Regions:
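Short Pro/Gly-enriched beta-strand edge/turn motifs at strand-loop
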Residues: 1-7
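N-terminal nucleophile
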Residues: 2, 13-14, 80-81
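A broad, low-specificity signal marking well-ordered, structured residues that form hydrophobic/aromatic
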Residues: 4, 29, 57
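Short Gly/Pro-enriched turn/cap motifs at secondary-structure boundaries
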Residues: 8-12
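A short, structured beta-strand/loop element
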Residues: 14-54
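Helix-rich interaction surfaces within compact, conserved domain-sized segments
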Residues: 43-81
Length: 81
């Protein structure tokens, strides 16, 4: 698997921070974010199950432009950025 790095939280010190990648082979977005606490996980479970093989992470709103870029990259892989 070859991940294509898209971006990092712009307010970061480059360590231990939210990041976004695209897996072009599997056509998936990959996120590193802050782990959800029990309270947030419980709120998520109120709309459906949270299986053991899934995780809830937080991504700051200031990364919206990076998320859009990742969506565009996976939807249009032929366009070089």
């Amino acid at each position: 698997m070859a991940l294509r790095f898209i971006g990092i939280d712009p307010d970061t010190d480059e360590h231990n921070c939210p990041r976004v990648w695209v897996d072009d082979e599997k056509k998936e977005l990959v996120f590193q974010g802050w782990k959800a606490g029990k309270e947030l996980e419980d709120e998520v479970r109120s709309t459906g199950p949270l299986p053991d093989y899934e995780a809830v992470v937080r991504i700051p709103a200031r990364m919206v432009h990076i998320l859009r870029e990742a969506c565009d990259a996976i939807e249009h892989p032929d366009v070089v950025r």
